[in-house]
């Protein structure tokens, strides 16, 4: 029945995304700092690693990570947080990223330019004879390469520092599948899970983040043909509608249909790789 009832599907998806009926920013800060501290200690590893873009998600996750390692050190556990800038050449909103770093106050800051590696991979694909439908498709592929190159860099640092990679995925992005599979979607821990966009903003403000970062227009900024394209432009609906949907509030039929469609077609992005034991298979003898 749930499959065909849009309101029931809304409730089911809200539960899937771990959206609680009640929200208290201070409680969520403590819950997520404790989670990060407990996870790192139990893993036996020493370092958290996170890419900082200058958006509210990485700003929030970064400050939570720094608070977690400071808590661990106060408890005599050796812990360290490395914040990494991962620009593609010159980033247009670099000033925002630097403001985020000043707010986060990470133990260590690194900068790794992904442009040479990302461009080299695109050139290698071109040399292989791979053809694209059009320039837009090539730009999209290049954008995904950038996201995955950032993942490679973060895991390289984590490998060198006995570290764990933090991801910034939250419920509003997750329900829409708005991340690159094995790119920004590749991480070990996701401390923002269970928060929609407005709640991430509320947590960031409770942490003391600058107002300009807390309310910055979100953009993945992966495509060169559409630089700084807002997330909401890609969705076709505003974050407020997605957040209302996740909080089980009334939304327009058009918004609900858009969210349900995105959720369905991006289902594979939220799952581990499928195996013959996960998926029904019909053989020629069936």
From Swiss-Prot:
<keyword id="KW-0067">ATP-binding</keyword>
<dbReference type="GO" id="GO:0005737">
    <property type="term" value="C:cytoplasm"/>
</dbReference>
<feature type="binding site">
    <location>
        <position position="57"/>
    </location>
    <ligand>
        <name>Mg(2+)</name>
    </ligand>
</feature>
<dbReference type="InterPro" id="IPR014729">
    <property type="entry name" value="Rossmann-like_a/b/a_fold"/>
</dbReference>
<keyword id="KW-0547">Nucleotide-binding</keyword>
<dbReference type="GO" id="GO:0008795">
    <property type="term" value="F:NAD+ synthase activity"/>
</dbReference>
<keyword id="KW-0520">NAD</keyword>
<feature type="binding site">
    <location>
        <position position="148"/>
    </location>
    <ligand>
        <name>deamido-NAD(+)</name>
    </ligand>
</feature>
<feature type="binding site">
    <location>
        <position position="219"/>
    </location>
    <ligand>
        <name>ATP</name>
    </ligand>
</feature>
<dbReference type="InterPro" id="IPR022310">
    <property type="entry name" value="NAD/GMP_synthase"/>
</dbReference>
<dbReference type="InterPro" id="IPR003694">
    <property type="entry name" value="NAD_synthase"/>
</dbReference>
<feature type="binding site">
    <location>
        <begin position="268"/>
        <end position="269"/>
    </location>
    <ligand>
        <name>deamido-NAD(+)</name>
    </ligand>
</feature>
<feature type="binding site">
    <location>
        <position position="168"/>
    </location>
    <ligand>
        <name>ATP</name>
    </ligand>
</feature>
<feature type="binding site">
    <location>
        <position position="173"/>
    </location>
    <ligand>
        <name>Mg(2+)</name>
    </ligand>
</feature>
<keyword id="KW-0436">Ligase</keyword>
<dbReference type="GO" id="GO:0005524">
    <property type="term" value="F:ATP binding"/>
</dbReference>
<dbReference type="Pfam" id="PF02540">
    <property type="entry name" value="NAD_synthase"/>
</dbReference>
<comment type="subunit">
    <text>Homodimer.</text>
</comment>
<keyword id="KW-0460">Magnesium</keyword>
<dbReference type="InterPro" id="IPR022926">
    <property type="entry name" value="NH(3)-dep_NAD(+)_synth"/>
</dbReference>
<keyword id="KW-0479">Metal-binding</keyword>
<dbReference type="GO" id="GO:0004359">
    <property type="term" value="F:glutaminase activity"/>
</dbReference>
<feature type="binding site">
    <location>
        <begin position="51"/>
        <end position="58"/>
    </location>
    <ligand>
        <name>ATP</name>
    </ligand>
</feature>
<comment type="similarity">
    <text>Belongs to the NAD synthetase family.</text>
</comment>
<dbReference type="GO" id="GO:0046872">
    <property type="term" value="F:metal ion binding"/>
</dbReference>
<feature type="binding site">
    <location>
        <position position="181"/>
    </location>
    <ligand>
        <name>deamido-NAD(+)</name>
    </ligand>
</feature>
<dbReference type="GO" id="GO:0009435">
    <property type="term" value="P:NAD biosynthetic process"/>
</dbReference>
<feature type="binding site">
    <location>
        <position position="188"/>
    </location>
    <ligand>
        <name>deamido-NAD(+)</name>
    </ligand>
</feature>
<comment type="function">
    <text>Catalyzes the ATP-dependent amidation of deamido-NAD to form NAD. Uses ammonia as a nitrogen source.</text>
</comment>
<protein>
    <recommendedName>
        <fullName>NH(3)-dependent NAD(+) synthetase</fullName>
        <ecNumber>6.3.1.5</ecNumber>
    </recommendedName>
</protein>
<comment type="pathway">
    <text>Cofactor biosynthesis; NAD(+) biosynthesis; NAD(+) from deamido-NAD(+) (ammonia route): step 1/1.</text>
</comment>
<feature type="binding site">
    <location>
        <position position="197"/>
    </location>
    <ligand>
        <name>ATP</name>
    </ligand>
</feature>
<dbReference type="GO" id="GO:0003952">
    <property type="term" value="F:NAD+ synthase (glutamine-hydrolyzing) activity"/>
</dbReference>
């Amino acid at each position: 029945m749930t499959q065909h009832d849009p309101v029931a599907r809304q409730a089911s998806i809200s539960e899937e995304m771990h959206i609680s009926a009640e929200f208290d920013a201070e409680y969520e800060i403590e819950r997520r700092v404790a989670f990060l501290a407990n996870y790192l200690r139990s893993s036996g590893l020493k370092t958290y690693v996170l890419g900082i873009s200058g958006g509210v998600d990485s700003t929030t996750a970064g400050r939570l990570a720094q608070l977690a390692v400071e808590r661990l050190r106060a408890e005599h556990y050796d812990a360290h947080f490395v914040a990494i800038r991962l620009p593609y050449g010159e980033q247009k909103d670099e000033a925002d990223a630097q403001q985020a770093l000043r707010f986060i106050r990470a133990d260590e800051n690194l900068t790794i330019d992904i442009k040479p590696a990302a461009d080299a991979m695109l050139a290698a694909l071109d040399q292989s004879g791979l053809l694209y439908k059009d320039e837009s498709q090539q730009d999209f592929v290049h954008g995904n390469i950038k996201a995955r190159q950032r993942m490679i860099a973060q895991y390289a640092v984590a490998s060198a520092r006995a570290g764990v990679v933090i991801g910034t995925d939250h419920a509003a992005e997750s329900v829409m599948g708005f991340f690159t599979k094995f790119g920004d979607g590749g991480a070990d821990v996701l401390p923002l899970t269970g928060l929609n966009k407005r709640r991430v903003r509320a947590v960031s403000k409770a942490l003391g983040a600058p107002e300009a970062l807390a309310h910055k227009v979100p953009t993945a900024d992966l495509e060169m043909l559409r630089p700084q394209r807002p997330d909401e432009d890609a969705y076709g609906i505003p974050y407020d509608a997605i957040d209302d949907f996740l909080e089980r509030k009334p939304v327009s039929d058009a918004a609900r249909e858009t969210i349900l469609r995105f959720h369905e077609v991006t289902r594979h992005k939220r799952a581990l790789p499928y195996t013959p034991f996960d998926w029904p298979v019909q053989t020629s003898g069936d």
